[in-house]
Amino acid sequence: MGKNIIEKIWDKHVVYQEEGKPDLLYIDLHLIHEVTSPQAFEGLRMNGRQVRRPDLSFATMDHNVPTKNLPTIHDPIARNQIETLAKNAEEFGVELAGMGHPDQGIVHVIGPELGLTQPGKTIVCGDSHTSTHGAFGAIAFGIGTSEVEHVLSTQTLWQNKPKTMEIRVEGELSVGVAAKDIILAIIAKFGIGVGTGYIVEFTGEAIHKLSMEERMTICNMSIEAGAKAGLISPDQITVDYIRGRKYAPQGEQFEEAANYWLSLASDEDATYDTVRIIHAEEIEPIITWGTNPSMGTGVSGHVPTLADYKDESDKAALQKALDYMGLEEGQPLTSIDIQHVFIGSCTNSRMSDLRAAANVIKGRKVHGDVTAIVVPGSYSTKKQAEAEGLDKIFIDAGFEWRESGCSMCLAMNDDVVPAGERCASTSNRNFEGRQGAGSRTHLVSPPMAAAAAIAGHFVDVREFVKETV
């Protein structure tokens, strides 16, 4: 019987195994940022330890960094975390892309950009959206601060082997439907707990037609489906993306690596513990209306009603979400006004995301009641976008063009949504207070966010696509 890619990678990385106990896994790449690492480095210091493999560790600053008025950091906690990471990286010999460095950016954007992320690797970071790197055919997952210290000390991690799940996206996407819509549709259909206890492989025609950046969006939000990690088997699109990048193998070594990477793809007769199927043709642009990512529906739809649910706990959850979001039962999604638009985050801040949004925005103006910002995912992405003139398109339309960072995805820096106001956001979480105390978050794709910025309320971006054809 054949193996799926999850089994292939996991089995290759087991250092020690004992029946009834977690496996000890070797970790190929440890990504570090300023928020979850200070206590881990302090633990090393207190116990007289060093980083075992600084060459397999890479650090950057992203969560707390300001995206305007650089280099000022007003919050003392944020400033301390950034300064502490710089000191720790220097003391322990870890490479750092700090503020002002040409490689700086959101950790889950720069890993792939730099060629650090490669198929077959085990990748960890003290951040839940480490699953992003699974787009390359890697087992990548977030860890806690104590685990960060363990990896720094030993380059290994104790882990229970998860079950395996295939989520197959059959068919082809319709025009105007984005990768973000695929993953939001999956979560809306199967729920935020569907992946609990599993590593998920995304398969199917619709998945393998996606670019690498689009695949990253899919895997980024596998954690919102409850999964330990999500990944996609590598193919020629994967190989072509990695070729020539800064930390990728070069020359003959690259060709050898590429052959190995392609061999990792799940065998034709591979099996999974669970299989779920969704049809791409049924997916339309999605808008979340509630306070978790499963509370979403197609743009042509409406907010659910209590009558749509039989279970009393589901009715209570709906009512709680409606109260927080300030929405009415049965309200059409296109009737929801917004005050903010955020295009950015580790989910949707790459070049293809910015181009897609700019295509909608070009020649149009941001609605007078909307404050809109674009935050590229890395310094490199920002420079490339500026070379293509995307910054001018956004600025001319009325967007603010910012420096790279996590920004408005989470209320951990200067970019927050005021209480009671709504944001059409390309980020990954719409929990209560995620973008600021009392803020109301609606998750959408970059084109949908751009269209909402123009209209001042949610609209079907496919109407804009028709206008430009």
Swiss-Prot record:
Protein residues bound to [4Fe-4S] cluster: C346, C406, C409
MF GO annotations: 3-isopropylmalate dehydratase activity; 4 iron, 4 sulfur cluster binding; metal ion binding
Listed NCBIfam families: leuC, PRK05478.1, PRK12466.1
InterPro entries hit by this protein: 3-IsopropMal_deHydase_lsu, Acnase/IPM_dHydase_lsu_aba_1/3, Acoase/IPM_deHydtase_lsu_aba, Aconitase_4Fe-4S_BS, Aconitase_4Fe-4S_dom, IPM_dehydratase_rel_enz, IPMI_cat
Organism: Lysinibacillus sphaericus (strain C3-41)
Gene3D superfamilies hit by this protein: Aconitase, domain 3
Top-level enzyme category: lyase
GO terms of biological process kind: L-leucine biosynthetic process
Protein name, entry field: 3-isopropylmalate dehydratase large subunit
Similarity-based family: Belongs to the aconitase/IPM isomerase family. LeuC type 1 subfamily.
Enzyme Commission (EC) number: 4.2.1.33
Record keywords, A-Z: 4Fe-4S, Amino-acid biosynthesis, Branched-chain amino acid biosynthesis, Iron, Iron-sulfur, Leucine biosynthesis, Lyase, Metal-binding
Function statement: Catalyzes the isomerization between 2-isopropylmalate and 3-isopropylmalate, via the formation of 2-isopropylmaleate.
Domain of life: Bacteria
Recorded name of the encoding gene: leuC
Short name of any one Pfam family annotated for the protein: Aconitase
PANTHER family: 3-ISOPROPYLMALATE DEHYDRATASE (PTHR43822:SF9), HOMOACONITASE, MITOCHONDRIAL-RELATED (PTHR43822)
Subunit structure: Heterodimer of LeuC and LeuD.
Cofactor note: Binds 1 [4Fe-4S] cluster per subunit.
Coiled-coil residues: none
Pathway assigned to this chain's UniProt record: Amino-acid biosynthesis; L-leucine biosynthesis; L-leucine from 3-methyl-2-oxobutanoate: step 2/4
Cofactors that this protein relies on: [4Fe-4S] cluster
Catalytic activity, as annotated: (2R,3S)-3-isopropylmalate = (2S)-2-isopropylmalate
